[in-house]
């Protein structure tokens, strides 16, 4: 039972019941929340092309997920980190500290970089997302990389 799992917790790829079951069985130390997002994430005006511009795949983004144009299957995720956090808090019994760990320290442990990422501590990289919560919705307020504030887009 030492294996870890990666979940696209966007509210589309996996149902709430499965997210809750995996949380109960594995716990936050064995779950990494991943966006697995395509280049269509955050775009507002179609068309959306994933892959290369020349030979890429056109996709349709509806209700927070990318589909093939004929809607025969998902074509990837368009979820962002704030959405994963919101989804886990809304659809599962996860606490805020548990959900944040699944987005930070657990992935860092899986990647073997938990000696410098995944925590806020002296001597660590200081890559930080500052979230806010309004009316139950999580939003990204500020982003720091190496302790430096990134300009807003």
Task: For each feature predicted by the language model, list its residue ranges.
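Short beta->alpha junction loops/turns
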Residues: 11-12, 136
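Short, Lys/Arg- and Gly-enriched loop/turn segments at beta-strand edges
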Residues: 135-143
């Amino acid at each position: 039972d030492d294996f870890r799992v990666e979940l696209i917790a966007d509210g589309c790829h996996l149902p709430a019941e499965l997210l809750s079951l995996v949380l109960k069985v594995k716990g936050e130390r064995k779950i990494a929340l991943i966006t697995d997002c395509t280049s269509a994430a955050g775009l507002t005006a179609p068309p959306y092309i994933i892959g290369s511009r020349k030979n890429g795949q056109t996709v349709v983004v509806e209700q927070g997920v990318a589909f093939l144009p004929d809607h025969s299957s998902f074509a990837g995720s368009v979820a962002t980190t704030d959405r994963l956090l919101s989804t886990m808090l809304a659809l599962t019994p996860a606490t805020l500290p548990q959900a944040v760990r699944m987005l930070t320290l657990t992935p860092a442990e899986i990647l073997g970089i938990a000696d410098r990422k995944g925590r806020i501590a002296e001597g660590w990289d200081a890559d930080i997302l500052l979230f806010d919560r309004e009316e139950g919705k999580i939003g990204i307020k500020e982003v720091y990389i190496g302790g430096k504030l990134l300009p807003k887009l």
